[in-house]
Amino acid sequence: MIKFKKIAVLLLISTSYMSLSAADVEFNLALSNDYIWRGMSQTGEDPAASGGFDVSSSEHGAYVGVWGSNVDFGSETNTELDYYFGYADESARGVSFDVGYISYNYPAEGGLDFEEIYVGVAYKWVGVLISKGLEQTPDNTEWSVALGDSGLGVTYGDYDGVGKYTLVSFDFPKEISGISFGIGLSDFDSADGNADEDGFVFTFSRNF
């Protein structure tokens, strides 16, 4: 089944929690050959090291988290830090939903900062995630289909006024020494036709 969560790049991270009082805490680390977000490389096609943590309440469905990665836009900034919070749950009929807010921050170049609110709904292996940009930030609509429990998935997105993208991903079903591995192929068609991209990404990740 598709479970909506904060998405910044193809991390393909499995879920593993440890209990801390009434909250669940998850730490994650990942190494990738590229950081691709909505079909566009955020590192100039160079490798990315990322990590973060989530604190969530299994009883109430609320969560809050921080995630960061290196970036390269050919400017002063080289770091992205994201802060997010939301509420996620699943109905008795198996319909899951996720509502939240995310702030994308670039400490060395604050003019790049932006914010979104998002709503995701999924049933079995099909889902849609709608992100509403704040203060003139473009909106984004993303459809995802997981092919059963095979680990194979397809995502199609429309980033309003920026471009459209497709991602085909495969998450290997077995971990090795607690490390997960995933691969993906992405295609981005820019709205003006001048910034099209094709990408391949592989990611090693681990949760604690």
Which positions does each model-derived feature cover?
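Outer-membrane beta-barrel proteins
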Residues: 2-7, 17-208
